Structure formats: C-alpha cells, structure tokens
C-alpha cells in the first residue's frame, strides 16, 4: 500500500456531484496550523505530498440552498495554474468540501478547461457557514499535491453537533450500515480503518468499484486542519470488508466518511474517532 503524507495549511478565510449531510457529507498565504494528508494506494510508502493554496475564483454571493458554480485553479511548482493533470482513481481532480463542524461532506470531480486550467464544479451548499475545500491532484510525472482554501457561505448556519467517538460500533449510513473499527489509532502512526458493510444486518455481496477502488475514505480533524484521503487495501478478508490505512498526524477528534458503491449509487458511512 502506498501512503503519501504531507503537511497541509488551511488558507486564510475568504468570503462539487455528490453531497452528504450527516445523519445516516488571488493566491493567499497559508496561515498557521500544519495538517496532514495521507493518500493510500499501492507502492512507494512514505513519499511526501506537496502543498498548495487553492485559488477560488467564486467568492461572492454564495448562499445556502442556491446552486453555485465554483471556479478555481490549483498551482504548479512555479505558481502558475496547472493545465494538464494525471488521472488518479478515474479523475483528474478530487474536490472535497466539508463544513466547519464536520456535519456536511461532498466529494466532487470538477471539469477542467485545458486552455486556462480553470476547474469548475456545480454545488448547492445545504447550510451557511465556513467550508474547508481540499483539491487532490497530480501533474503528469509530478507528485501528489493537495491545495486548500476556506470559503464563507451566507444563509442559515446552524451549529454542528459536538463530536463524540462512536467506533468501534455498528453505524448507519445512506441506505447501508457498517461495523466500523479503527485499529492502532495513535498520533503519528498508521491505523487500520475497517468497514464491514451490511444490509439488514447481513453482509452485502454486491459492492462495486468506485473511482477505481472498492471504496474511498476521507478523514478530517475537528479543526479542519488535518486531512486524510485514503484508498483501500484490496486484499479484503471478505467481499463486504474494506480496510484502509490512514495516518493521523496529531491527537484529537477526527470525523471520517467511508464511500462505497452499490446498485450504481455511492453510499456514505460517517464515523468519529478520538486519537490519543
């Protein structure tokens, strides 16, 4: 399994399609607060991922409940917009959007304008408030990079519920449930995040590949500064078991979203873990 880890910086506050509301998700200088990015896959363990600041063009007029077309660019090593992207897990860019408080999650795959490098994704913010944006990408022959930003969305912004650890446990998701466990959770060490996907209490037998893998995992710390995007170990013990390797950079609460495909639909199972 390849694990690439990078320190991330949340961009200064500035004022996508599948979404999940939990229940069942001009270049600025980075501010303080390093975070982490884990990207699981195949070989070359331990490579460092590059850091960048996402340049969000759509800044004004964003409001909860109103469809928006988000436009942004991500930089190359020289600071210019990337125009050519390598395909990773069936997409050129993975665009993750999470509300502060971690009660809203979206994983989008934006369109790319090869002439300008401008990326665009349509999204309707379900709630107002501050959103953390993460764009995972790689130039051909380059290294994995994560660009970040924050954006403020107008409209009703109800406070998110506080985070409480709920693993190990049987957790409800969107039209699916899973027994979720996190083994070896310790700051600075790789843990194993295991999902046993169930339907009606019975193991499912029909999981489908989603974006080139049997699942995707995104995990973010309570403050939004630590970020993990991992892909599974394909050597599963059973057809309904999906296991991810994920390194948690620092102690504290983290919320995760496991994504699995059944019947042509992507299902999301959220969980919360406290890392010592």
Stretches with model-predicted labels:
Residues 1-14:
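Sec-dependent bacterial lipoprotein signal peptides
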Residues 15-276:
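Intrinsically disordered, low-complexity terminal tails/loops enriched in metal-binding residues
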